[in-house]
């Protein structure tokens, strides 16, 4: 089994610490016998250093083992779980530095008791196989932790978007699909194709596909809304301005290759949101709505329309600005999808930056779940479609709802907003997005209509 340099450091450190504990030596004892400093030996055992051959020979003599036994990794049972974990991708891909750690820091914890470490690693590997937990699950969990650490708000990306719009090269033009596309074609030498994806037998569900080159090619699904196309163009501009090289090439994930790729995708999405939906307009519009004593769904959807935003983009943007501008410290976002031919409602996207437990899917046969705001909107769309915007086709007209909820299993209280509409790439199916906040004192001081009598209190559950 091949090992990279870092993994060899980990394995050597594991073996040396194991030998020292078996012999009952202290670091000082080994330092004296091998003529090395205690600090250097400690670095080796932590997997941070790999000594030269003469020092390895001195350590082999100290422990009375052969040189080859010290440097080879095959045929030793107590090393098998460590070797498996190192090659699993977790140690290689997980962004330890994001949390002020290195892989060696975790390794040093595991090597305190080699036998127990082996059992622990075997347990994690078995659980991962049983529940199909892959490295990308850890990477997306790390991204959520990163967002939570920063309250889902990034001033550098806000400023980057505003700086671009104020630049001479943009020239104060309206931020729309046409102008963003033109910028990419002229300044990025992009070739943009809207003919291939929509009718392609396997790629028709993709919003975009990117192919790098001297003249980058961007394939765009022609069935997208102008605002959705503008968002994709905004991400491409963000990729260029932020100097990003490691990126996803498709709108939907096919393979997650690294945390850098996951983080960069988030950063370009954030940039695009800040570019298209400026924080000043969002904060101003929401402040007016939140100051009202009654819930105004038409006004809520009107603000979304004035920002030329899809429900998902609108809710994501609110979530990014909620803490910094409204003092709402935690929230969750969910996107529900319901196919016309099925009763089951799938949770197709979730971002939980709260302590509230969330479901992975809904069934019409579950009484508590039918009372979720987004669930109810999907059920009611047959007669609610088009109420807010009669000028739009009835099937695509968005509908909105606000709700006070009490979780049956935990007693937690939540205030949530939901917007539903038809799916753009599959008009016979519907989707709904939900943005929820814990109903604490901060929320009650910001959203004045939290106790609007017209809003019913609902007892909801996650099953």
Regions found by a protein language model. Give the residues of each.
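Short juxta-domain linker segments that transition from a proline/glycine-rich
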Residues: 8-11, 18, 22, 28, ...
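N-terminal intrinsically disordered/low-complexity leader segments
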Residues: 1-6
